[in-house]
Amino acid sequence: MTPWDTTIVLAQNGLNLEGPVISAFPSNPILSSVVYLGATQYAPGKILHDDPDVQRIGAFANQNFDEGVVENKAKRWIAIYNPNDKLETIYDPDVMRARWRKLVYNASYNPVAAILGLDTPRMRMSRHIIDDLIRPIMREIIAAAEACGVSGFPEDLPEIVIRGDPIDTEFKPSMAQDAEKGGFMEIENIVGEPLREGMKKGVDMPTLRTVYGLLKGLQLKVKESRGLWVPGFENGHPYA
């Protein structure tokens, strides 16, 4: 890791993942990669990648680096990753907006699918799951983004995202796949951080808050199954 030269690319979903990395590597440029692809893990080491790889690349806010320096690093990454121009790899100076835009899907379909164990077509078929859970979460995410200064979303964005997945498959978002395998889910950056950012700005987010509580309960079961949580009441527990 060469200071002022080696570039770190974070392709994880969600918000506020860059803070610990910037603290640990203050002398390295940090790029934000917002990735869109479809993949299903059927068994260990067996993954069906059935959708093109699309990336939007930009820089995380980092006062240690001039904007032009990081822009050049982002374009260099694109040249390395996509040398033959066969992939849709785009430099996006407003990559934070792309992160919030992706959360409109990830913070709604992902957690609800994990909690219910349903694929996206079945959630759409049910109607009430869309009306009572998915669309309200999408609107809460957009409201939080706008309160945080990220704007420019089309009015019909929730309706576009609701209908984004094909209906002729039984596709389950990654969080649902993790839950079915008894694995850990990306709860905090996808759900917890957007919720906290919105609440800090005074945005009412009741649907996402309820879903967040349910996800933490599911995660607790995973921790217990792996010996990472032992049931019991510590001293001063309010519900003992």
Model-predicted regions and their roles:
Residues 1, 24, 84, 147-148, ...:
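Alpha-helical structural context
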Residues 1-48:
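Rossmann-like NAD(P)(H) cofactor-binding subdomain of soluble oxidoreductases
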Residues 12, 34, 51, 61, ...:
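Residues at the C-termini of beta-strands that transition into short coil/loop
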Residues 45-75:
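Short beta-strand and adjoining strand-loop segment in the mid-core
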Residues 68-114, 160:
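FAD/FMN-dependent oxidoreductases across multiple families
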Residues 87-88, 119, 151, 204:
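Short coil/loop linkers at secondary-structure junctions
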Residues 96-123, 129-142, 169-170:
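Active-site-proximal catalytic alpha-helix in oxidoreductases
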Residues 124, 131-240:
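NAD(P)-dependent Rossmann-like dehydrogenase/reductase catalytic/cofactor-binding core
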